[in-house]
Every structure is written in C-alpha cells, then in structure tokens.
Amino acid sequence: MLEVKNIHAAYGKVNVLRGIDLHLEEGEIVAVLGSNGAGKTTLNHNLCGLYCPVEGSVKFSGMDITGWRPEKIVEMGMIQIPEGRRLFPNLSVLENLEMGSYKRGKASRIQNLERVFQIFPRLKERREQLAGTLSGGEQQMAAIGRSLMADPKLMIFDEPSLGLSPILVEEMFQLIADINRQGMTILLVEQNVVQSLNLANRAYVIENGTVTLSGKANKLAENPELKKSFLGL
C-alpha cells in the first residue's frame, strides 16, 4: 500500500533524513520508533505532502505521490493524526469532526459521523462542547474521529500517546488496535517503544535520519541494541 524509497530531506543545509526505506502492506500496523530529533515527524511531513523530499520517492496505492499537495494525498486516502492533535479549540466537537469530511458528500458525512460516534460515544455526548474544553484523552479521540471522517485507507498516527496519562495511553493503543481490526492500515510513529512493539506487526527504528533496525516487532522487542538504546537494559 505504501512504499518509501531512499527518502532524503533537509531544512536548508541541515540534512534530516538520509535514505529512508520502508513499506506497509494493507491491513498492517507498522511502527516507526525513535527518540526526539531522530527524524520521525519530518518523515511524516514528507509522506503527507507538507514537505517535498530532496531525493527519493513515495508511492501510495500504486501511484507515485512524491511532491503532491497535502489535499490531494488526503483525497487518495492517506491521512495524518498530528502530534498535539491540532484541533480548533473555539469550535465545537461536531464542527471539528466535520472539518475532516469537507470533501465528502452529505450522505458520506452522515454515515462517517455515525461510525465515529459508534467508536467514540463520549464524543457524541460532547458534540456541542468546545473542543478546547475537552480533556487530553477526549481531544485525542476527536483528532482520530476527524481523520475517520475523511474515510481514509491509511492512518498515520504521530505520537498519539504524547501528554496522556499511563491509563489513557493503554486505552489509546487499544483503540488503535480496534481500528486496525476493522481493516484500517496504520503507520504508528512513536517514542513509546514497549507499547508500540506490543501492538505492531513490524517496526523500523530511526536514529539520526537513518533506519538502523527493522523487522518483525516481536523480534525487535528482544533485540539487545534496541533494549540498550531505548530501554536502558
């Protein structure tokens, strides 16, 4: 479904990504792991069209989308749930959700909204409440719901556990698993190594803009290099 080949990216003269290769098959959960500054968010931005790679290519559903504008990539079915959630705090929950379906017809919007409220009954209860008054966990639900309103094929989660309590982190990862079981392909970009490897089918580890480890998640969980670098073991 997604094939990334030899992606290089830079901010001015500062190289951030140096030859990233990765792929996702339909129905998978694939994790991209790394510490702050490793290049994870830059990779996301290059996949979603916010930045154009200096070199390399991005293919999605068999089409080369390198350099496409973000809205065209969203129309193709790839959508990002951004770090920090990026809701409109002075709009209601319902208005924020509807932002995700502005390109959809009325029938599609209604159907997708029913689906979101089925997954997140709490959002239905708070649909008229201002998004800025929600708790951190509820805001993350709203950000995910907004993305589901676009009827995506691939969801890219950028640090979904950031700023959440341990209990809410558990709930968030369970929610991602539930969405995947409904057939959604997921790219999970995270610092939470243990939870991510428990959830994912495969994983890539990025350090200083390059992939240093990759493979099946259960195998990587036992890798001594990863344990030393990220778990202090």
Where are these regions (language model features)?
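Glycine-rich phosphate-binding loops of nucleotide-dependent enzymes
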Residues: 1-233
